[in-house]
Amino acid sequence: MSQDTEGPPTITINNYQLDVGKEFTYLSSTVTENLFMDSEISRRIGRATSTLARLSKRVFDNDKLTMNTKMTVYRACVLSALLYGSESWTVYSRQERRLNTFHMRNVTRILSIKWSDHITNNEALRRAATPIIYTLLRQRRLRWQGHVCRMQDGRIPRDLLHDELTTGKTAQGRPQLRLKTVCKRDT
């Protein structure tokens, strides 16, 4: 889980050595060995897709519900499943584009917009009264950053954000994207 070139650490509890895994799930979020977000994004898209599928017949394909009600359910259920834990994600632009593609596909489907209608994404978002995914990610990160900045000194999230726990060497080559860098980009 570090960027060091050394092997993974060995952890022993009561004379039992724990196995080192490539990835694990903690609080419904996937943590990988290389700290990339690809598997987490795939899992979030999968969860949001299953939520959307379960609600399709009753909500999104129901002609008796207003568009406002459908979009409220979409934001409350599907976007919540999609963006769960996104406050601490360090996503690259290709991953943001993947999330935005999923979001726009669902918005245009809920609004019953066909590709032959020649409606732009901005117009579809305006009709749905929902922001683009980049804005949603930025809002969540900034809200979390404000929460962390108000924490007392010595709290682990605050120390991590302000690089007060950094020790060791970094790997050669381009450094991985950090949450601090993403937060600076947002402000």
Please identify what each model-predicted range represents.
Residues 1-187:
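Short linear motifs embedded in intrinsically disordered, charge-biased segments
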